[in-house]
Amino acid sequence: MTDKLTEICDTKRNEVAARKGAVTVSELTARASEQSAPRGFEKALRGKAAEGFALIAEIKKASPSKGLIRPDFRPADHARAYQAGGAACLSVLTDAPYFQGHEDFLVEARAACTLPVIRKDFMVDPWQCLEARAIGADAILIIVAALSDQQMAEIEAAALEQGMDALVEVHNEEEMERAARLRSRLIGVNNRDLKRFVTDLATTERLAPLAPDGTLLVAESGINTHADLLRLEKCGARTFLVGESLMRQADVEAATRGLLFG
């Protein structure tokens, strides 16, 4: 695990331990049962990717490497703009210490649109899957670099039990091999090197041929233009996760449309 990722996950484990003490499993289960059914995150992506480009548009206020990204941060407005611009799904950052995220941002975004939403956070405990469903998440993220094979399998099983999908994120060949051992065939390639925090679209191009049969490959990070989508389509990627380059635009809807359709 990279140093920054180790630090973030250590912080997250302490945070989860504290939250576990503040709410019972039965309370979370009750909240989860009150939520509307999962909206079908992977299904929505596969449907869009079958006819064109599928976009997971990210609602992100800040990041450790870039600081504040969107000063006038309004999750509900951004969600509506992304949907109007043609996004297939949303990603909402809920990590507070490093990304200035919050659970409420996901709740607000999901209520403002009809798109499936992934809770973008650092999953270190299966308990977080129940918590994610309790706030309405339709999918969760599994970062291979942050977890052992057993931890990944347990978190994936907990997500599936709640009817959610799991986006499995990799950055190199070894992680792709480990991701293939899971049931999920929704695999994201992070083009950002978490050790050096530089991005290179060639990462997706290199790893795409190694994805297991039946995989819906998601290219993540460093994607800024329609030309980037056309480049990555050549290696088989038709699904993309984009946040920062869209969140920095004054007109998010127009920027989303421009990214998808040129």
Swiss-Prot record:
Enzyme Commission identifier(s): 4.1.1.48
Coiled-coil regions, chain positions: none
Keyword Repressor: no
The reaction(s) this protein catalyses: 1-(2-carboxyphenylamino)-1-deoxy-D-ribulose 5-phosphate + H(+) = (1S,2R)-1-C-(indol-3-yl)glycerol 3-phosphate + CO2 + H2O
UniProt-listed Pfam families: IGPS
Metabolic or biological pathway, per its Swiss-Prot or TrEMBL entry: Amino-acid biosynthesis; L-tryptophan biosynthesis; L-tryptophan from chorismate: step 4/5
Keyword Amino-acid biosynthesis: yes
Enzyme class, UniProt record, top EC level: lyase
One GO BP annotation of this record: L-tryptophan biosynthetic process
Keyword tags: Amino-acid biosynthesis, Aromatic amino acid biosynthesis, Decarboxylase, Lyase, Tryptophan biosynthesis
InterPro entries reported in the protein's UniProt record: Aldolase_TIM, Indole-3-glycerol_P_synth, Indole-3-glycerol_P_synth_dom, Indole-3-GlycerolPSynthase_CS, RibuloseP-bd_barrel
UniProt-listed SUPFAM superfamilies: Ribulose-phoshate binding barrel
Molecular function as annotated in GO: indole-3-glycerol-phosphate synthase activity; phosphoribosylanthranilate isomerase activity
UniProt xrefs under PANTHER family: INDOLE-3-GLYCEROL-PHOSPHATE SYNTHASE (PTHR22854:SF2), TRYPTOPHAN BIOSYNTHESIS PROTEIN (PTHR22854)
NCBIfam families: PRK00278.1-2, PRK00278.1-6, PRK00278.2-4
Family stated for the protein in its record: Belongs to the TrpC family.
The protein's name in its UniProt record: Indole-3-glycerol phosphate synthase
Origin organism lineage: Bacteria, Pseudomonadati, Pseudomonadota, Alphaproteobacteria, Sphingomonadales
Gene that specifies this protein: trpC
